[in-house]
């Protein structure tokens, strides 16, 4: 069913994590050729010659047009600028090339950011030292999700679309930059954990905007890919200190290793996302 088809995962590093999982599964059958990458290897495309199947990951962490001042390690040199009324041409210009897409937003919207509309700054999130209108991240997130889904449902090109919901992290006793960790070794049981307020706020926006878009989608190309609850129950599935190989090798004993309690180990819980995605495709 995927012969001569193309599929793209559009979004942030969770989308990249997801496509890495799918690559691990697919390469057990056929080894692909890497046919494209951007300068930073964040957007990439692979081609499976026997299946004539093309798989891409498109780096667009805000889904909106933005200017980001970060190096490869995620260290920011300035505050990012988001244009809330313009989608990111990085994915919009390539949308017509894809038969299937998975798209979603996430934790990048928590970052301090300047917000623009009509090329004019309208406010800022999390920058009290600036003499600007204070806007919550939910303002930008709703704009991004609303514009993204409207573009997809109104486009003449009808890519079958999985709209992925947000993924909660499992940092405990701090955040990624304040000593938070994730050392649990078993999943949570049902009812043992609940979403925190910021994740609930994101999820509310996602479900509301998806419902509006689905109601206007006459071609029925849009599907909700709800990974939030699945992710919430798996605090045991993160790389922790092993986001890079040999994290403790040659390290100063007094220097802490940064932990990753957001992304997923491979193999790991994220592999189930691909099982669910394939099941949804087969039942269409």
Where do the model's predicted regions map?
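A compositional signature for long Ser/Thr(±Pro)-rich, low-complexity
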Residues: 1-284
